[in-house]
Structure formats: structure tokens, C-alpha cells
């Protein structure tokens, strides 16, 4: 943070608008008492959301609880501690819960949204507190907040929550921000930076295949793509044991492939640095044309994988997406040698989550409806599971309750067998995977890693509280699949 970059601290224009809502509503002579109560509560909820954003970045904040006038003292102090910051935020949330209606129009805040926010704020507050009694109370408050949510259920069609199908009908969405095609184009949404840019002319020049049925069906400005690190956490159902395991640990993968050395796949790498001590490489045991390593990697996955990720040989927008060497959207599919060049995915994966399937392609000036999910019941349940894992430090019986709670999203969203974890360490392991995949692309993982690092212990690989977080020290990885789909390796992304 410096004079040119606020690192999220400078939200005071937003805070002023929240305070205006509160004060103008309270002073109104035209509003009913019921309307005043609801609007004041809405203002406090918005203020809490804004300060939570600042607190996650900075810890201590400058708390402004009224509209500042020109004659006011502007040399306001920081909160004396992080604990005090979260006390103020939680007070606003509790006031909001008391004043908000239980139900509301879509896109409008209600008391259940405030409870969902409280559950997550309590987790973060507990992570940054050194008071053991306070931590326990915060975990208990998080559980109670989620238990208080009424009228929402998990959506068995996970992907629909994030596209046109379930935007306004999903039983899981508590609060979302909606955009209308009347005043929204592709460039005004995340889709513009999540989809690639490729033409049949470029495919012809580079030698990639197959051609697209609709030329330029993908003509966006891709800025980021899912990493293999994320894909690793979408578990596979082992066809012998019926347990959820990592893709390269399943019986069907182990029995049909052979590990390779880096030297065995060096010809597939664009740069020798892509292969290192952490690389994985395999080949199929059979060279028959109808045997492909993709089948052993991508079949029988957590269902959220198919709703979230475009991968080699999947269909999207009525197009066959090929991300193997020589594929139409392979990481070098512009010039055959430069990964990620020309808005092509550098990891050989593309986002599917949060992509609408419209009659017209996603394009910068094509109108589109859109929405962002802010609070949903599944996320709240995962917050409850984490709070129960926190309480397991004081009461070991909470482990089974935590596992039962995160198994609800694991089985309903992922169609996976339930976790059978019984120890606190195993429960944390399975919970972290579950949160990673269920909340992918929802602005959660980085902040969760920080929180788990501050908890320490089983939440961060047995390390002391505040120690190094291994996931933040690990390089991003990609997958490379040979043109005949008999070999593959996982390599390190070069920047």
C-alpha cells in the first residue's frame, strides 16, 4: 500500500453512501416506520460488507459511522485492534439481521443474506484473534448464523446457478447482482476475459484442428484460465472402491497407464523449464487409437468439474474443444510455439462456470443478461463446516458434525461419495478440497488460504499459526496432452 495504490483501503466514497442511506432514511418524514427500519438495516449491511472488504485487506480500519461534514475532524484514528474492527462489523451485521425482512425481491438484501455474511465474517475474525475464548464464541456464532438461514436449499444442478438457466430460479441463491441485456454487453461481464479468441484462418495457418462450425464463435480477450492445481481437486470416483480420489490415484487410471520420466515427455514441452521435480507424466498402456489418456483423467469426475471447466475433447457452444497438442484451442494455437499468445488459455483449460450460453455468441458488443452470485446457501454451509472444525479443538465430537455438513455440498453438487474422514486432520483435508472446488471463481480461495494459515495446525498442514502457506508458494501448473492422446504431463507455467 502506498500513496498511489490503496490495496482496497480507499472505499470511503462507498462508506459515505452507506451512511447517507442510514441517515436520510432515519430523518425522512415520508417513509413509514417499517420502511425506515428496513432501509437503515440495508445501509448497515452494505456498510458491513464494505468494511469487511477493507478489513480482509488491511485488518485495522478508519471507522466512519456518520456522514462527514466539512467542519468535522478528518484526522480519524484506525481501530485500535483487528478484534475491534470485527466487533464493529459484526455489530452492523447484527443490526441488519434485526431490521431486514426475511424475504425480499431478487437482488435485494434480506436477513438471510446478512446471516450468510455473518458466518464468514466470524471465521475471519476468529482467524486473526489471539483470544481463545473469543475464537470459540465466534465459531459458535458462525454456526448459529447458518442455522438461522431459512427458505433456501442446495441446488442439485450446480452449473445452473452461474448461467442463464438458474440465475433467477435457483433455490440456493440468497443474493445476486443482476444485469440486463437492455444495458449490458459481453464486454461488461467477466465472460469477456474468460473466453478465448480463435479463428479458422489462424487454425489453418498454425495447422490446428478441428475447424469451428461457426468461425469466430470465440472472439473474446481471455486473461486467465483454470490451473491444473485447481483441476487436481476435482476428485474422481474410483470404479473399484467407489471412493473419491485424485485423478492419478484411481484404480482405472493406475491400471491403464504407466508413469514416465521428464525425459520421456521432453519433446512435448515448449520450454525445458516447464518440466521440474514436481512434474508428473504418464502414458497409456495401450497404443490403440480408441484408447485415450483423457478417458482415464476426465471421466467419472466430480460433477462440478464439468460445470466449471472446459477440457480437451469436451463440447461447448456446439463446438468440439480440443486442448491437446495440435488442438484448436491448445496453449500454442496461434503460432505453434508461444503458450498463451493471442488470448489463448495458457493452462490448456478454459472456464465454463459463469459463462452464459446465449443464442448469439459472447462478443464485446453483443447484448447479454448476466449475474454474479454474492451469497448462496452452499457457501454458508461450508462456513458452518469450517466453524465446526474450529470448535473441534474444544470438542472432538464436532468433527463428525463438520464432515456431515460439508458432505451436503460434496454429494449434492459433486455427486461424489461422502467423505469418511474421522480424524480432525483428515476432515480438514477433505474440507479444504471441497471448499476449493465448490467456490472456484467466487473470490474465496486466496482469502481462505490466508485464514487457514492464521488458524495453523490441521488447517495448514500441521504448521504453527501464521506460518508459511504451501499453496501460496506453489507455482501454477498446466496440463499437456500429446496429439495422439497417449501421453501427458503436468508442467509449471512460465511467465
Language model: regions and residue ranges:
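Conserved, well-structured interaction surfaces
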Residues: 1-58, 74-87, 91-106, 251, ...
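C-terminal substrate/ligand-recognition segments
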Residues: 2-5, 279-411
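Long, intrinsically disordered, low-complexity segments
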Residues: 11-12, 88, 162-249, 326, ...
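Alpha-helical solenoid repeat scaffolds, predominantly canonical TPR units
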Residues: 17, 21, 85, 92, ...
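Short coil/turn linking the two alpha-helices of tandem helical-hairpin repeats
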Residues: 29, 55-62, 104, 121-133, ...
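An aromatic- and glycine-enriched ligand-binding surface/loop that stacks and positions planar moieties
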Residues: 112-115, 120-331, 459
